[in-house]
Regions:
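Short glycine/acidic-rich loop motifs that flank beta-strands on beta-rich extracellular proteins
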Residues: 73-74, 293-299, 335-341, 359-366, ...
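Right-handed parallel beta-helix
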Residues: 280-291, 322-336, 346-360, 372-391, ...
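Extracellular polysaccharide-degrading/modifying enzymes targeting complex plant/algal/animal polysaccharides
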Residues: 32-330, 371-395, 637-638, 648-682
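Bacterial N-terminal signal peptides
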Residues: 14-25
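PDZ/PDZ-like peptide-tail recognition elements
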Residues: 676-718, 722-725, 774-776, 785-791
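Short glycine/proline-centered loop/turn elements that form peptide/ligand docking sites
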Residues: 684-693, 700-704, 723-728, 733-756
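PDZ-domain C-terminal substructure recognizer with occasional recognition of PDZ-binding tails
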Residues: 732-735, 741-742, 755-791
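Extracellular beta-strand solenoid repeats
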Residues: 63, 70, 76, 90-92, ...
């Protein structure tokens, strides 16, 4: 054993057969097991355990020297590896060291042979793999259509991805995968190809990836891992039967003999206690986790009645654990989840990490269904109230609670699995999600999958560029679907009228969404869906999508700013107890199938007297006001209102505008920030500058000359000045000289007049979640309609 003693150290430590260097601190309070990439990390953990057994009061650290550690198996820590509150076990990088824990294996000594069409091949022995890197760069598994990072979803899709004419070219498609969005764009579906049938058609396995009875899209799909589709530079294919690895380099370049890394592991560190022996007091810090295999074919566990299927694994997994700290790490190039906090966990802190370029979710707090009373596992399932367990709250402690995700930078996630989130919470209690920056995600930035058991705090986050590859969702999304919930709304009204206590059997504590900045250009900024209940939403700056409240009970929404958008109330129940007060909205409400309007909708600021009048016509907003909010400096992200703003007269108060998102200087320097929208404001007659919308250049009809030229019976509507080629407006056959009179909603019977360009822009913003919008237009002195597909 190599024994490093600091000055004045007199006590000797003899540990037989230990090969790693052990440094003993001078005060006798700490010992460090120093490891390098050539050491066996599992043996290092054994040495740390021996040190702890020798002196349980001593702090133990496993300290990694700089380098890449290619693990052959995950590092699994159990209750025996626990530290104490005063002296936790630490897994950490040496000061200033760049330490990478990799789940990949190096492929060395490769002998490449030219094959055909610019493709080379080499033999690779060992287990199969589904991820391949060259010099740290992820390569593309052979696919159709070819990968283009600028195209969404999936880097490109094609309706003919699995057409019979294409399939006929495939000699051995077994092992291939069809990736598709669901037809309603609620998430992704993966379908394994098992081979060909007697008729030459594909034999397919079961669809994986989403907890709803849905069909895959006919058009938004691609196929991968098919040899015959290997036709682009940097594509590869591995034949697991013959062990040939095929690769297409740049033309005229032969592949290198080294520098290739194949995926091997799905997990890198697992903190695994048991119900009888929890692991506790462990810190993981300063490490980089990368190069893990995909897990999408294992994403098969339904998370109650949410839309999610889930895989309980990630680069770091914590289960049956207490007082765990995961801090200042980097997670990138992962095939699945980054951090999964599964089952019983208490006082887990996830702070200061950067998570990006991964296949699934960033951070997930997910309890076990055995902790849930009367659990159901699919949207359409229901149960009679007579059979419900009426005891409130959980029935066991197999769930995460009293934990925090704070100051994390999470971006470019969900590369493979589109039903994913920056932070996911399901079957958990009292989780705090604070000061995180989350952006460039395919679906929600933050998702709460069910009502069990509330008490969460979502605060000070910066969440934007969300719902980029799916639809009908938000930067923040939640479902309720608690034990009493039914998809039959009339049945729900009957149940709650008979026993109002049902609504808080699972959602036993209020969830707070406070002081966040959110922007969703393809859905809602905050989306409380399907029975989400017991929420307080206050002091949020919402930059694009507004707030949707569907079904549910006891939602208090107050003192929020909805830039260029509004409240979207959908199918509220009788006696819902909902409150919407002291908010700034910038267009009229967008109700759908509303027969009941909650406890109080009042004291709000509308942009125009017309919008306020529409609200009052429905029986709400008796004390609300209309007028410009008078934001101080929107271009510089300051949407505080001026001292003379009418917002102050309805009880709105300003909140801070400069402390959203990550706090750490390093992460703050790396984090992007959302683009600030220009508020839609009507200009004085004759003073309006043209603006851009959906590829059109538009302005309000505001002069007699414009009215006369277009043949309008009155001075109203929005004049189309120009249409950009290949834009959404161009595809809808809108033309220069058209006048847009109103937005028509075929499905729900709502429509909005668009007398000005500002009204058109705001009304369009309120409908982005639908994916299309129908305009009533005036062309050659006749009315017609145009359907525009929204980007």
């Amino acid at each position: 054993v190599t024994l490093h003693r600091a000055p004045f150290r007199s006590r000797r430590l003899a540990l037989a057969a230990l090969a790693c260097a052990i440094f003993l601190a001078s005060d006798g309070s700490a010992a460090i097991v120093r490891v390098s990439p050539r050491d066996d990390l599992h043996r290092a953990l054994t040495k740390a355990r021996a040190l702890h057994d020798h002196n349980p009061a001593e702090s133990i650290a496993v300290e990694f020297a700089a380098g890449t550690y290619r693990l052959t198996a995950p590092l699994i820590l159990t209750a025996r590896d626990s530290g104490s509150e005063a002296a936790p076990l630490e897994l950490r990088a040496a000061p200033g060291a760049k330490v990478i824990l990799s789940g990949g294996r190096s492929l060395r000594g490769l002998k490449w042979f030219a094959w055909r069409d610019g493709v080379w091949r080499t033999r690779v022995e060992g287990p199969s793999f589904n991820r391949l890197w060259f010099e740290g760069r992820l390569l593309v598994r052979a696919r159709y259509p070819n990968y283009d990072p600028a195209k969404l979803p999936f880097g490109g899709v094609a309706a003919d991805a699995a057409n019979p004419s294409r399939v006929r070219r495939w000699s051995h498609p077994e092992g291939g995968i069809i990736h598709a969005l669901s037809s309603d764009r609620w998430g992704s579906i993966q379908i394994p190809i098992e081979g060909k049938g007697p008729d030459g058609g594909l034999r397919l396995g079961g669809a994986i990836g989403i907890n709803r009875t849905v069909i895959p899209s006919d058009s938004e799909r691609f196929v991968e891992n098919i040899l015959e589709e290997l036709d682009a530079v940097d594509e590869w294919y591995f034949d697991q039967n013959s062990h040939w690895l095929y690769f297409k380099p740049l033309q005229g370049v032969s592949p290198a003999r080294a520098g290739f890394v194949a995926g091997r592991l799905e997990a890198l560190i697992e903190l695994r206690g048991s119900p009888a022996a929890r692991i506790h007091d462990v810190t993981v810090s300063g490490l980089e986790f990368r190069e893990t295999e995909t897990t999408f074919l294992k994403t098969i566990e339904p998370l109650l009645r949410s839309d999610w299927m889930f895989y309980r694994g990630g680069a770091i997994l914590s289960e049956n654990a207490q007082r765990i700290v995961i801090s200042n790490n980097r997670f990138d190039e992962l095939g699945g989840n980054a951090i999964v906090v599964s089952g019983h966990n208490r006082n887990v802190a996830i702070r200061g990490n950067e998570i990006y370029d991964i296949g699934a979710s960033g951070i997930a707090f997910v309890g076990r269904p055995e902790a849930v009373r009367s659990p159901l596992l699919e949207y359409q399932q229901t149960q009679p109230t007579a059979g419900l367990d009426r005891a409130p709250g959980p029935q066991s402690d197999a769930y995460p609670a009293d934990s925090i995700a704070e100051d994390n930078l999470i971006h470019a996630i969900g590369a493979i699995e589109k039903q994913s989130a920056g932070v996911e919470i399901s079957m958990a209690a009292r989780i705090t999600v604070r000061h995180n920056s989350i952006y460039h995600v395919p679906r929600a930035g933050i998702n709460i999958g069910d009502g069990t058991w509330g008490g969460h705090v979502i605060a000070d986050n910066d969440v934007f560029d969300t719902v980029l590859e799916t639809g009908d969702h938000g930067s923040f999304n939640s479902w309720g679907r608690d034990r009493y919930w039914s998809a039959d709304r009339e049945e729900m009204n009957r149940r709650v009228a008979a026993d109002s206590s049902l609504v808080v059997l699972d959602a036993i504590a209020s969830t707070v969404i406070r002081h966040n900045r959110m922007r969703c250009d393809h859905g809602w900024d905050i989306d409380l869906d399907d029975g989400s209940s017991n929420y307080l939403i206050e002091d949020n700056l919402l930059l694009a999508g507004g707030i949707k409240l569907r079904e549910g009970f006891n939602r208090i929404v107050r003192n929020n700013i909805m830039v260029n958008n509004t409240l979207h109330p959908h199918v509220w129940f009788a006696n819902s107890g909902d409150v919407f007060e002291h908010n700034v909205v910038m267009t009229g409400y967008q109700p759908i199938l509303m027969n009941h309007w909650g406890e109080s909708i009042d004291f709000n600021l509308f942009p125009t007297a017309d919008a306020l009048g529409h609200a009052r016509g429905r029986g709400t907003d008796a004390h609300s006001a209309a007028g410009s909010a008078r934001f101080i400096d929107p271009q510089e992200a300051n949407f505080a209102v001026a001292a003379d703003s009418p917002a102050l007269s309805i009880g709105f108060h300003n909140f801070s505008m400069d402390d959203f998102g990550v706090l750490s200087p390093l992460l703050k320097a790396r984090a992007q920030r959302p683009i600030m929208p220009e508020p839609f404001v009507d200009k004085e007659s004759g003073q309006e500058a043209p603006r851009e919308l959906l590829g059109m250049t538009i302005k309000s009809i505001e002069t007699l000359g414009e009215q006369s030229a277009t043949g309008l019976p009155s001075m109203q509507g929005v004049l189309v000045l120009a249409v950009a080629q290949d834009s959404p407006a161009d595809h809808a056959d809108l033309r220069a000289g058209d006048v847009i009179l109103r937005i028509v909603d075929d499905e729900f019977g709502n429509s909005d007049p668009t007398n000005t360009a500002a009204e058109l822009a705001a009304a369009n913003a309120g409908r982005r979640w639908r994916g299309e919008v129908v305009f009533e237009i005036w062309r050659q002195q006749r009315k017609s309609t145009a359907k525009v597909h929204l980007p």
